Each structure stands twice: as structure tokens, then as C-alpha cells.
């Protein structure tokens, strides 16, 4: 996805992002498809539930400018330096019943953004574990 923002007093801003992911049903269920929309299958064995394994990569680039470090004490920023980030996510879903799901994700983040406070690029690379229980009808 690419976006361009018109700005009155500065050059236009352009940023982009994209992702790709895949999901595999470990217990052999088939995906439903109706009217151009995929649907989550029901567990083949309601007693054991359905297990899924997923992988995702996403990235965003919100830098549309540059930093001139000719004078390290006072770098000059031109344009927008919104940062860059990419993530790898590995996840597992367990559909305990047809209307109850447990999800767990592990996310590795790689991000970098220019900081005017420290006058340099700052990396932030957390590792995140997410867990969710979901009831739906």
C-alpha cells in the first residue's frame, strides 16, 4: 500500500507498506470459500479442536526525506523521517470448539527512526508475545 499526502507548505509525503502471510491447518480441515470470501473451517473433531500455524512478514517505510550530518551537532532534516519497521510473526491458533479460539503470536520487530532529541537514528527491536482467547458467534 502506498500513500501520498499533499502538503501546502512542504513537499508532498509518500510512504509505503506491505505484508504477506500464510496459514496452514495442521489438523487437515479445508477452507470454506463462498462469494469471494474465505471462511474458517469447523474442527473435524470437535473433541480435539482444530490447530492452525501461521507466518507473516510486514514492513512499513515512512521515511520520505534525508538527514545531512555535515554538522553532527546540528543535523539538517529535509522531508519526513517517520521511520522504518519490519516484523516477523509466527502464530498458532487452537479452535477449541466451533465458537471459541485461543491464539498465540511471537513477533520479532526491527525498527529504526531518526530522533531529533539524540540527533541520530534510534533502533528499537522488541520481541513480543501475544495471547488471546476469543468467543464468537
Regions found by a protein language model. Give the residues of each.
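Outer-membrane beta-barrel pore domains
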Residues: 1-137
Amino acid at each position: 500500500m502506498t500513500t501520498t499526502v499533499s502538503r501546502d507548505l512542504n513537499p508532498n509525503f509518500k510512504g509505503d507498506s506491505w505484508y504477506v502471510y500464510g496459514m496452514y491447518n495442521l489438523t487437515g480441515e479445508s477452507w470454506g470459500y463462498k462469494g469471494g470470501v474465505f471462511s474458517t473451517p469447523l474442527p473435524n473433531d470437535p473433541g480435539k479442536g482444530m490447530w492452525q500455524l501461521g507466518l507473516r512478514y510486514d514492513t512499513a517505510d515512512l521515511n520520505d526525506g534525508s538527514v545531512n550530518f555535515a554538522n553532527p551537532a546540528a543535523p539538517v532534516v529535509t522531508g519526513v523521517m517517520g521511520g522504518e519497521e519490519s516484523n516477523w510473526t509466527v502464530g498458532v491458533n487452537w479452535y477449541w470448539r466451533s465458537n471459541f479460539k485461543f491464539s498465540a503470536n511471537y513477533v520479532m520487530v526491527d525498527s529504526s527512526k531518526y530522533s531529533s532529541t539524540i540527533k541520530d537514528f534510534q533502533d528499537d527491536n522488541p520481541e513480543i508475545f501475544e495471547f488471546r482467547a476469543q468467543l464468537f458467534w
